[in-house]
């Protein structure tokens, strides 16, 4: 499914008048609450006050999945930057040079891990005078992608025994999400 997501992402980018490989990515993570089946590998996310698994994802600027990595929820976001950056460059043919991230990816180690793979991290911060909900530039794209994935029942919680199964289901969900857009793009051409 990973190869299908890669091919569909390239086709959708070309249909949108963009280059086949993105030059920027957006990184974020979301915590999925564990179930008794997945409980053995679950960790506790203190920020979300939830026990489960954390899905670290990278999407392009259109919201299409580049790569993802599943860890226990107790893992810090900044510790996953190196692995995500390597997978991003593999998926994008070494063309991504900039990644938009939230406050969870701050720190010298995270920036150095990304730079080892040729990616500069740009932290998108909340405005000083924040009142209520604020739409952050660039960051809303990855949140929308998580919203798309959460519509699939198997991805609303972590029901899986193995992390690679959970990752595979995310790739499958994005294939299902991209296919209708491909048919729309092909009917225009």
Listing of model-derived features with the role each one plays in the protein:
Residues 1-189:
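Short alpha-helical elements
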């Amino acid at each position: 499914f990973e190869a299908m997501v890669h091919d569909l992402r390239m086709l959708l980018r070309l249909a949108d008048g963009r280059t086949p490989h993105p030059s920027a990515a957006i990184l974020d993570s979301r915590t999925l609450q564990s179930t008794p089946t997945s409980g053995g590998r679950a960790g506790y996310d203190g920020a979300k006050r939830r026990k489960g698994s954390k899905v670290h994802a990278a999407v392009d600027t259109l919201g299409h999945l580049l790569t993802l990595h599943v860890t226990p929820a107790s893992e810090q976001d900044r510790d996953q930057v190196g692995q995500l950056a390597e997978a991003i460059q593999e998926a994008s043919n070494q063309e991504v040079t900039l990644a938009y991230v939230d406050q969870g990816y701050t720190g010298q180690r995270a920036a150095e891990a990304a730079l080892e793979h040729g990616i500069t991290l740009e932290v998108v911060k909340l405005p000083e005078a924040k009142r209520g909900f604020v739409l952050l530039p660039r960051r809303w794209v990855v949140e929308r992608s998580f919203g798309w994935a959460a519509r699939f029942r198997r991805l609303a919680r972590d029901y899986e025994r193995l992390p690679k199964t959970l990752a595979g289901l995310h790739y499958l969900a994005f294939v299902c999400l991209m296919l209708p857009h491909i048919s729309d793009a092909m009917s225009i051409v």
